[in-house]
Amino acid sequence: MGGFQFKQFRIEQDLCGMKVGTDGVLLGAWAKGGRHILDIGTGTGLIALMMAQRFRSSTIEAIDIEENAAKQAQDNIERSPFSQQIKVFHTSIQQFNSKAINYDAIVCNPPFFENSLSCNNHQRTLARHTNSLSFNELISCCIKLLTSNGVLSIILPTTTRNSFETEALLQGLYKT
């Protein structure tokens, strides 16, 4: 599958397990921004780039656990007009060290398949299944990394929404 041309940047996706989809485009279009933004599971870098395009004075850090995805994001960002605004890290959120930066906004299109069959493609399994990042871990990490008024913007299927919201409430993260 080829790349996608957006208004001010192009996304190549040949190295990523998960390709550009409606979920990521929607999240990048409506997520709240801030001065410091973190994109968890950046994949192609699409959401980080959309946030940079929308919030020109923001600094954005984008992370991905999958090496090829982090490389693809880095390549896409380097070819964009927003390369000075975004830094990409190949790491898991559990291992990520933000150097004491707290984020005003975190965006995430997380893996959401729980207890389901994984596919033969390891990259796709990492991107789609909660084995490497449970909702509990994601919420816990976000709470530690957000400022006191910070916002987590996330997109989930309706089938997992209730379990995510319950876990968020149990950990003290509230829906606005």
Q: Which sequence ranges carry the predicted segments?
A:
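Mobile active-site "lid"/loop adjacent to the S-adenosyl-L-methionine
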Residues: 110-137
